[in-house]
């Protein structure tokens, strides 16, 4: 119920604003409604190409999650690799991207690579908003 209502409100906001800024949240609502393929459709839409870099990262994280929902861990990894994976990035969106990538690698059984990317996530998350260090200890 709530996902459906949220999606309707987001669609209305998108119509009023005329821009793509709500795509990542809309895609996440589609996932919440059990429609991961719709989330991926939104990530592939023409509007998605208009997003700023940070919003593209958020949409890629959602699309990767949708691929994982469908059992496609390798597809999730590839989805995240479409973003700027430069280790020198320092914004919180980089920490979230690196974390999502590390998590997908861990699920795929690629533990050494997962450790490397959880470390990178922790390095650009000085406020420890994410649990990257704890995930490192678990691996």
Language-model regions: role of each:
Residues 16, 49, 78-84, 109-130, ...:
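TPR/TPR-like (Sel1-like) alpha-helical repeat modules
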């Amino acid at each position: 119920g709530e996902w459906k209502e949220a999606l309707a409100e987001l669609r209305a906001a998108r119509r009023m604003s005329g821009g793509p800024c709500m795509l990542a949240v809309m895609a996440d609502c589609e996932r919440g409604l059990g429609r991961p393929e719709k989330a991926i459709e939104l990530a592939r839409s023409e509007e998605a190409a208009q997003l700023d870099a940070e919003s593209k990262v958020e949409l890629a994280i959602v699309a990767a999650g949708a691929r994982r929902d469908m059992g496609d861990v390798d597809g999730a990894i590839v989805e995240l690799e479409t973003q700027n994976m430069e280790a020198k990035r320092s914004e919180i969106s980089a920490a979230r991207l690196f974390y999502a990538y590390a998590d997908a690698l861990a699920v795929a059984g690629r533990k050494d690579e997962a450790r490397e990317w959880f470390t990178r996530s922790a390095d650009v998350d000085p406020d420890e908003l994410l649990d990257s260090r704890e995930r490192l200890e678990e691996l």
